[in-house]
């Protein structure tokens, strides 16, 4: 750098030097974003429910909601209903045309542990409208309102529970939600992180959770902003 006679500063740095400066900043930014992504992923993995004696398995609720996606979820929902944990069960996200009998047939070895379709027909509703977790929450909210329910036991896979709770608590603010995670075979293995398929499953779920969190954030900010002036007064 030099100063001309009139006092104006003139930058004699080469263009390549300036480009290197911007390149370094960009590299630092990318490294920071990667570090933030990894930190978030580790936090997400740590928050995924694990089998624990502290899990609430005894509180009865007005209804049970099972999110489709695996035989373990269905079997758990039917078992809870049979044990009297609730009087009604909604299976949300059923493919169009699929019947209760067909869902029971998909239980495989677990089929013998649940009542037959005729016994379940009185208390089980199949929801065909939902195509996503957000859709599950919307479909469930409408069904719960029709049935006058104020509490629900939510059954889904443990790795899916964080996003499900986020969507349900955002969509059903007046409903008490009791999480009831099930543990699919692929995540029961203590060395699941060595299996590419399971790692991809968790990473994809992490990305979906971030997207759901981004969708929920404006509503949370609005709620906080409406609460803040009142709390100050």
PLM regions and their residue ranges:
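Short linear elements at protein peripheries
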Residues: 61, 219-233
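Membrane-proximal intrinsically disordered regions of secretory-pathway and membrane-system proteins
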Residues: 2-26, 109, 121-124, 143-144, ...
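A transmembrane-helix-recognition feature enriched in membrane-embedded lipid enzymes
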Residues: 195-225
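A structural signal for short, hydrophobic/glycine-enriched beta-strand patches
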Residues: 2-5, 49-196
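Residue-level micro-sites within transmembrane alpha helices that shape
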Residues: 27, 72, 204-207
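N-terminal type II signal-anchor transmembrane helix
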Residues: 12-55
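Aromatic side chains
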Residues: 44, 159, 168, 206-209
């Amino acid at each position: 750098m030099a100063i001309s006679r009139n006092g104006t500063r003139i930058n004699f740095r080469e263009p390549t030097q300036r480009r290197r400066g911007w390149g370094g900043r960009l590299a630092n930014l990318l490294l920071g974003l990667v570090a933030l992504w990894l930190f978030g992923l580790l936090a997400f993995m740590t928050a995924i429910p694990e089998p624990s004696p502290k899990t609430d398995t005894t509180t009865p609720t007005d209804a049970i909601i099972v999110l489709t996606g695996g035989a373990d979820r269905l079997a758990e929902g039917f078992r809870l209903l049979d044990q009297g944990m609730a009087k009604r069960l909604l299976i949300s996200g059923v493919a169009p045309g699929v019947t209760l009998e067909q869902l029971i047939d998909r239980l495989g070895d677990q089929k013998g542990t649940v009542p037959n379709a005729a016994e379940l027909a009185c208390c089980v509703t199949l929801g065909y409208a939902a195509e996503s977790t957000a859709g599950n929450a919307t479909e469930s909210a409408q069904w719960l309102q029709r049935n006058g329910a104020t509490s629900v036991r939510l059954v889904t896979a443990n790795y899916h529970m964080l996003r499900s709770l986020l969507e349900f608590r955002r969509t059903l603010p007046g409903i008490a939600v009791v999480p009831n995670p099930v543990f699919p075979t692929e995540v029961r293995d203590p060395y699941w992180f060595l299996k590419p398929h399971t790692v991809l499953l968790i990473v994809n779920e992490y990305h979906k959770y971030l997207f759901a969190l981004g969708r929920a954030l404006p509503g949370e900010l609005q709620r906080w902003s409406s609460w803040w002036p009142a709390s100050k007064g």
